[in-house]
């Protein structure tokens, strides 16, 4: 006689073993119809799952995040079924859920084309209309191996062979299609109505470049067709804002094969970077940071001592000289500790704040590189605060306020905060980690702001606070971090003399606000769609003439505006004024200054604001005052 406790505390008593579906029906037919799965004592199960003893139960529907994940996973299996119906020689491998969708990897020697995607998607919709029942059943490991061998599914067989002997495995059947899966799945294919196949890509079997290349099919799936349409609209908008497209139009940067993952900054793009750095330098100065600069190449022995070699050796660029091994720095922290170690410090010297626009290199896999968002060479607004344990909370609190202020200045008002705790492979004792995690949690609680845990996502040397921006499309970008580190300063012999004249090890707070400068520029490009705030835009105004008669006047105006500290260019080409205006409007310059005979006679300019608004005629002095007020 199981007693089922629902999320609101309501209890239902049943005379015998009961399924999740039956419990849902006892609550209401509409809930039973909407049910996709159940959560029994914290474990997700199918709606057919039988509850034999007292249990806590939540009915999972498409309105839940967990329900959406089940929809996406079930749609991945629907994709596999539809594909094998059309292409029987295609072998299935894996099909996990990812952000906003799913993918499935196939082994298919003939390869899929874009036209194949349309056929597969059409077949998926046919299977949805058939409303196939999705059923779970079990096999022993040996039975499953033989079953998939007989089907010619050698990759699936390899997966099962890697599972420890003696285990019972779950499989799912829909129509004639059977696949290995832990589940749960939706009960019927008719529950899967809002999906779209997005693209094809290559992927190595088990992520190893020595293995065979697979065909990866990406898709997206949602609870409703409206949700799907909204997502596709967001993707269209994101494509329009793609920093790679805008970067080319605005002549900001380029990337080429000879330097994969490394940026060739053009003049305007580099100006944008420098403006960001100048602003952040002011932030450093106002908050008592000492800006430093450290070497790019450092002996391997330091990276071994710091722990980076063990954790990141595979992603570090290395070289040798005079029988010594060096690594190009992937991060700046060990180098900053070397600066700290020059001269014994007193407790009166703490907190000591060091900052650097440090150029770092990481050998990211070529397949993960993406414009300036994911690169191999990047600059960080890196900083390290050396302090005592008693100073942690104040320093963390100050940094949180500072970070929010910087983001607001760049136009980001929506920021989520996450506290990432110790990963499995971490250095330092659990006692030290307990202390570090508690220090960050206390600092966050003291700020009375919303935050959430991310278990196991901390750095190998300490827990961290992550600052996640939301852009105009509600996309999330993790930028800022603050990490408490009790381990590395001890490993690298950092010390200070306390008030009792005893040597102690300082705590190091690793902190960055923007993170990768390259990535932050990419975020800004897409957030503003190239129409940056006036203080940040590489070119604030372009001066154009209507005819050749005004050429000297345009040159004179441009010089005057530059002397006032404005970033201005001129366009004296013998082109029609309409052509010039259209061309410079595409560059998203804040102002186009037009000069004709009337303006030249009165020593004035006609001002056109970004977006096409005509501000009329004004003096050069009035324009300078206007733009300065806007910047302030």
Swiss-Prot record:
Domain TGS span(s) in chain numbering: 1-61
EC number from the UniProt entry: 6.1.1.3
SMART domains xref list: tRNA_SAD
Catalytic activity, reaction form: tRNA(Thr) + L-threonine + ATP = L-threonyl-tRNA(Thr) + AMP + diphosphate + H(+)
Family annotation (Pfam families): HGTP_anticodon, TGS, tRNA-synt_2b, tRNA_SAD
Organism: Ruthia magnifica subsp. Calyptogena magnifica
GO biological process assignments: threonyl-tRNA aminoacylation
InterPro entries: aa-tRNA-synt_IIb, aa-tRNA-synth_II, aa-tRNA-synth_II/BPL/LPL, Anticodon-bd, Anticodon-bd_dom_sf, Beta-grasp_dom_sf, TGS, TGS-like
Name of this chain's protein: Threonine--tRNA ligase
Residues covered by region (Catalytic): 242-533
Cofactor: Zn(2+)
Subcellular localization(s) per the UniProt record: Cytoplasm
Binding site for Zn(2+): 333, 384, 510
């Amino acid at each position: 006689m199981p007693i089922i406790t629902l999320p609101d505390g309501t209890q239902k008593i049943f005379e015998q073993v009961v399924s999740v579906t039956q419990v849902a029906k006892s609550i209401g037919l509409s809930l039973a119809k909407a049910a996709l799965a159940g959560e029994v004592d914290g474990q997700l199960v199918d709606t057919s799952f039988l509850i034999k003893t007292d249990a806590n139960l939540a009915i999972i529907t498409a309105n839940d995040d967990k329900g959406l994940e089940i929809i996406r996973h079930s749609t991945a299996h629907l994709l596999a079924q539809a594909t094998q119906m059309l292409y029987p020689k295609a072998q299935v491998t894996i099909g996990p859920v990812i952000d906003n969708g799913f993918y499935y990897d196939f082994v298919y020697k003939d390869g899929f084309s874009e036209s194949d995607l349309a056929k597969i998607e059409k077949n998926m919709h046919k299977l949805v209309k058939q409303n196939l029942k999705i059923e779970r059943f079990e096999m022993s490991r040996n039975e499953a191996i033989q079953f998939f061998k007989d089907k010619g599914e050698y990759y699936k067989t390899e997966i099962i062979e890697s599972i420890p002997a003696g285990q019972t495995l779950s499989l799912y059947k829909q129509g004639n299609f059977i696949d290995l899966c832990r589940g749960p799945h939706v009960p019927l294919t008719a529950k899967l109505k809002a999906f779209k196949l997005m693209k094809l890509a290559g992927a190595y079997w088990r992520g190893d470049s020595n293995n065979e290349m697979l065909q990866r099919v990406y898709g997206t799936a949602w609870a409703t067709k409206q949700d799907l349409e909204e997502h596709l609209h967001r993707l269209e908008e994101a494509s329009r804002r793609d920093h790679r497209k805008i970067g080319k139009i605005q002549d900001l940067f380029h990337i080429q094969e000879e330097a994969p993952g490394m940026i060739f900054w053009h003049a305007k793009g580099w100006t944008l970077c420098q403006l960001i750095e100048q602003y952040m330098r002011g932030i450093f100065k106002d908050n008592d940071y000492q800006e430093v600069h450290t070497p790019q190449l450092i002996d391997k022995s330091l990276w071994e001592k710091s722990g980076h070699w063990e954790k990141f050796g595979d992603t570090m660029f290395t070289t040798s000289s005079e029988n010594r091994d060096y690594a190009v720095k992937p991060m700046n922290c060990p180098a900053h500790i070397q600066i700290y170690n020059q001269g014994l410090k007193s407790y009166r010297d703490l907190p000591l704040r060091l900052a650097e626009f440090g150029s770092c290199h990481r050998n990211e896999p070529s397949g993960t590189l993406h414009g300036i968002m994911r690169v191999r060479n990047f600059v960080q607004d890196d900083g390290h605060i050396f302090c005592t344990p008693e100073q942690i909370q104040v320093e963390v609190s100050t940094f949180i306020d500072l970070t929010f202020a910087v983001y607001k200045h760049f136009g980001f008002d929506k920021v989520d905060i996450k506290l990432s705790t110790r990963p499995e492979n971490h250095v330092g004792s659990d006692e030290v980690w307990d202390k570090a995690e508690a220090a960050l949690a206390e600092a966050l609680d003291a700020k009375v702001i919303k935050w959430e845990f991310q278990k196991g996502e901390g750095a190998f040397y300490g827990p961290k606070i992550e600052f996640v921006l939301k852009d105009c499309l509600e996309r999330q970008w993790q930028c800022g971090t603050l990490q408490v580190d009790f381990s590395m300063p001890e490993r690298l012999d950092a010390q200070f003399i306390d008030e009792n004249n005893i040597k102690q090890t300082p705590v190091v707070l690793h902190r960055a606000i923007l993170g990768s400068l390259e990535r932050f520029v990419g975020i800004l490009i897409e957030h503003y769609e190239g129409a940056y705030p006036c203080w940040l835009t590489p070119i604030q105004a372009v001066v154009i003439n209507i005819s050749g008669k005004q050429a000297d006047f345009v040159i004179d105006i441009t010089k005057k505006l530059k002397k006032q500290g404005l970033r201005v260019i001129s366009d004296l080409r013998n082109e029609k004024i309409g052509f010039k205006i259209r061309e410079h409007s595409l560059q998203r310059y804040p102002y186009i200054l037009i000069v004709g005979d009337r303006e030249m006679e009165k020593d004035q300019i006609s001002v056109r604001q970004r977006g096409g608004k005509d501000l009329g005629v004004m003096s050069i002095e009035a324009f300078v005052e206007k733009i300065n007020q806007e910047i302030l």
